[in-house]
Amino acid sequence: MATKIACFGEVLFDVFPTHRKIGGAPLNVGLRMASLGIETQIISRIGEDEIGTELLDFVTQNGVRIDSIQSDKNFATGEVVVKLDDKGSASYTINYPVAWDKIEATPEAQSVVANSDALVFGS
């Protein structure tokens, strides 16, 4: 039987001065696991917005299942503004409130966790 990984938590865009990059610690782990051929699913929440759609497309194209990414009409997909100092050290400004703070423990999400071999969460 194949290993199954569930990742729970934030999905977002890191916004740098010159570009944006999809991120969020649980999603980063999920993307890496999927690149190794491990069946991976992310449990999170995005806004019903353009960047949420972009995020879903990217995650799907990279082999992570999105069945448990919830959609929110009231809160936006997460964005974190990243500033680098002269030495390259980063500081972060998280725009609140965002959809990932509203992830619900739906029966579907609970089933994903129950049927996985491991749960990844946190930053």
Regions found by a protein language model. Give the residues of each.
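Glycine-rich phosphate/adenosyl-contacting loop at the front of the ribokinase-like
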Residues: 1-65
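Conserved N-terminal subdomain of the carbohydrate kinase-like
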Residues: 39, 43-121
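Short beta-strands and strand-loop turn motifs
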Residues: 9-11, 118-123
